[in-house]
Amino acid sequence: MKGVRAAFLAALLCAGGCVAQPSDPSSPPIERAGISVGSIERARAQLVDIEKRSGGRLGVALIDPAGAVLLSHRGEERFAMCSTFKTLLAGMVLSGVNGLEPEDRLIIDPAAVEGHAPFTRSRFEEGWMTVGDAAKNIVTVSDNGAANLLLDEVGGPRGLTEWIRALGDDVTRLDRRELALNENAAGDPRDTTSPLAFGETYRRVLSDDTVLDAADRDQLARWLVASETGLNRLRAGIPGDWRVGDKTGYCAAPGAVEINDVAIFDPAGGGWYTLVFFLDRPREAGAFADALGAEVGAIAADLVRSAS
């Protein structure tokens, strides 16, 4: 779990900007990673159409295993993360920050548990859970109670944000815990990211051996593949014979709903593509928004398949 973490932090804590953020592709499009200009133009037009039909604001980023931005829509605009931050929190825990080990115990206070927390509630009788089980369940079932317990262990939202800064991401920020982080107030930068920044940070955590060692990267990927919350969103548009995982997010505040999903997929064993889908204030949530996510997944898959 510890691996190269000390060297990683020493190398990256150099003004927080050592790793360049991917830029938002601008018009006119250029060929990217063997994908034709025409294919990119068609994909962009499809995203514009999806946004119009949604009645809300759509953020998308598709990044290849090497970090090339293949597609984006509102890629540098801020969106609430909702529960998608939990993948980064799990990655931070796997890095062994603050000496955390998977078998360490976290004490549960039932009175402090809010919202969706199926695993935490299943542990009320025992009164504790392990760090490893908490990290697994914040990804696979998006457990809020486990997320808050882990935040307590890593220095709170500020601690996670500082870890993200050390990855070279100066955009993504977590300011509050569950459930407050889901407020999604208009113009409020708290608990937000951009599709491009988030996609690149996701990619690094899942692919860069200076962040996590191979065993921990594989563990995090397996949790994402096992996730149960996003089967009808991005995954529904990605071919079933590709390896795919995802982490969803849902901000449910009245008048400020956001439907999110961040997927990783590997068509042929060549590494993880990262696909970010943020849908802010759509006219409907539920199956309607999920179906739009599936369309975005299909657009991304078609684009990757079109590469020469």
PLM regions: where:
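Conserved catalytic neighborhood of penicillin-recognizing serine enzymes
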Residues: 113-150, 157
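Active-site SXXK
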Residues: 68, 80-108, 138, 275
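Mid-domain, small-residue-enriched loop/turn segments at the edges of structured enzyme/sensor domains
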Residues: 57-58, 135, 148-207
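Acidic helix-start/capping segments at beta-turn-to-alpha-helix junctions
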Residues: 65, 103-121, 154-155, 181, ...
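Short, conserved catalytic-motif segment at the N-terminal edge
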Residues: 56-78
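Structured C-terminal helix/loop/strand segments within mature extracytoplasmic catalytic/sensor domains
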Residues: 19-50, 66, 70, 153, ...
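Short, well-structured active-site flanking segments
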Residues: 95-113, 157, 161, 213-216
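C-terminal motif of bacterial Sec signal peptides marking the signal peptidase cleavage site
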Residues: 15-17
